[in-house]
From Swiss-Prot:
The active site is at residues 218, 223. Belongs to the glycosyl hydrolase 7 (cellulase C) family. The biological conversion of cellulose to glucose generally requires three types of hydrolytic enzymes: (1) Endoglucanases which cut internal beta-1,4-glucosidic bonds; (2) Exocellobiohydrolases that cut the disaccharide cellobiose from the non-reducing end of the cellulose polymer chain; (3) Beta-1,4-glucosidases which hydrolyze the cellobiose and other short cello-oligosaccharides to glucose. Residues 390-429 are annotated as: Disordered. The gene is egl1. Its main location: secreted. This is Endoglucanase EG-1. Glycans are attached at residues 78, 164, 204, 208, 394. GO terms for cellular component: extracellular region. InterPro entries: CBD_sf, Cellulose-bd_dom_fun, ConA-like_dom_sf, Glyco_hydro_7, Glyco_hydro_7_sf.
């Protein structure tokens, strides 16, 4: 997962033809979604290319009134412009984004995300993008993976200790929570939720006047870097979640030489991750009973870390939330595919790659170290495909995707970073909050570990 954020962006949801005056698209820069080809596969027909793209999260975007006064201040909203949902929807325009400047590039079936980008004032700014898979209709692609599998190629070689390249599923609404006050919806990255129950200014596309967190089922397919990785389901009820989850981490499960540069899964090179959601009757209509992780590299299947297979078949911490059965229902109804890259100013990502979890030292993941030594850190996802179990890596039948470049259960509980919350009443701006810009009157001092980074004349942000 990735934390909530806020960046200046722009417009162009007009093509879906259902806009009214409510969190209206702005006019500064068109919202042009980067095309990302993905593949849907069957055992009988092979893999068929899908017309898909990616969209940057709503919370990264600049929102303003007709006079370019910011609709957000001090991590919340400008109560003059946004005293209630209806008035805010009428007054505020949400802008699109320059995807390249936000660290995002896509070509064919390949998506590259950068943690840092050169700053106009010199040095680098942390951009930490989070994106969602979008269909040609301007709504999120809903992946229904119960009794199915998801495969993708990934290059983690440029992610050092402390970085997290994440690819996961979130049970967001297909339309991004679009409603009468927010017609931008999924086309502008609205409606994010996860098992950390983040508290955001907008909750499922609507002004969050109550300050509630937004919880939903989350399936972390990959959280990792070149030194460690975890596969973790997070089941939820309507108001609470198994935020820690029961993950499978090879290092944390007693296999320290399985995943890393030069190891069994050699992270100095591109490899394929296959995640299978197994049901009791072997079909999408069954109950989810286990989740299995597999790897391929250079076209060869890699043996599992654990002799009985790298499988999660139970999750004690999730029992209060329905366990794997709850996750299976979410996978059956459809979940949104999320891509992100981020690092961690508070815990240095120790829960992922240090101590019991990995070989990194407790301070190696400090973002200041990453920036000093690896300003070009990035992750590359490619050849994303989903469908019948066994179909996504089968080279026979239909039109397969391009080849990748040249049972016992073990679970590993992690302590996750805290979720994004409302800003402090003191005049110190939170991480990701606005800290400057023409007409901005809120707090300009950023919380410890972040600095105020210029985005444009109307928007600067604590990063």
């Amino acid at each position: 997962m990735a934390p909530s954020a806020t960046l200046p962006l722009t417009t162009a949801i007009l093509a879906i033809g259902r806009l009214v005056a409510a969190q209206q698209p702005g006019t500064s820069t068109p919202e042009v979604h980067p095309k990302l080809t993905t593949y849907k596969c069957t055992t009988s027909g092979g893999c068929v290319a899908q017309d898909t793209s990616v969209v940057l999260d709503w919370n990264y975007r600049w929102m303003h009134d007709a006079n370019y006064n910011s609709c957000t201040v001090n991590g919340g909203v400008n109560t003059t412009l946004c005293p209630d949902e209806a008035t805010c929807g009428k007054n505020c325009y949400i802008e699109g984004v320059d995807y390249a400047a936000s660290g995002v590039t896509a070509s064919g079936s390949t998506l590259t995300l950068n943690q840092y980008m050169p700053s106009s004032s010199g040095g680098y700014s942390s951009v930490s993008p989070r994106l969602y898979l979008l269909g040609p209709d301007g709504e999120y692609v809903m992946l229904k993976l119960n009794g199915q599998e998801l495969s993708f190629d990934v290059d983690l070689s440029a992610l050092p200790c402390g970085e997290n390249g994440s690819l996961y599923l979130s049970q967001m609404d297909e339309n991004g929570g679009a409603n009468q006050y927010n017609t931008a919806g999924a086309n502008y990255g609205s409606g994010y939720c996860d098992a950390q129950c983040p508290v955001q200014t907008w909750r499922n596309g609507t002004l969050n006047t109550s300050g509630q967190g937004f919880c939903c089922n989350e399936m972390d397919i990959l959280e990792g870097n070149s030194r460690a990785n975890a596969l973790t389901p997070h089941s939820c009820t309507a108001t609470a979640c198994d935020s820690a989850g029961c993950g499978f981490n090879p290092y944390g499960s007693g296999y320290p030489n399985y995943f890393g540069p030069g190891d069994t899964v050699d992270t100095s090179k591109t490899f394929t991750i296959i995640t299978q959601f197994n049901t009791d009757n072997g079909s999408p209509s069954g109950n989810l009973v286990s989740i299995t992780r597999k790897y391929r590299q250079n076209g060869v299947d890699i043996p599992s870390a654990k002799p009985g297979g790298d499988t999660i078949s139970s999750c004690p911490s999730a029992s209060a939330y329905g366990g794997l059965a709850t996750m299976g229902k979410a996978l059956s109804s459809g979940m949104v595919l999320v891509f992100s890259i981020w690092n961690d100013n508070s815990q240095y990502m120790n829960w992922l790659d240090s101590g019991r979890a990995g070989p990194c030292s407790s301070t190696e993941g400090n973002p200041s170290n990453i920036l000093a030594n690896n300003p070009g850190t990035h992750v590359v996802y490619s050849n994303i495909r989903w469908g019948d179990i066994g179909s996504t890596t089968n080279s026979t039948g239909g039109n397969p995707p391009p080849p990748p470049p040249p049972a016992s259960s073990t679970t590993f509980s992690t302590t996750r970073r805290s979720s994004t919350t409302s800003s402090s009443p003191s005049c110190t701006q939170t991480h990701w909050g606005q800290c400057g810009g023409i007409g901005y009157t809120g707090c300009k001092t950023c919380t410890s570990g972040t600095t105020c980074q210029y985005g444009n004349d109307y928007y600067s942000q604590c990063l």
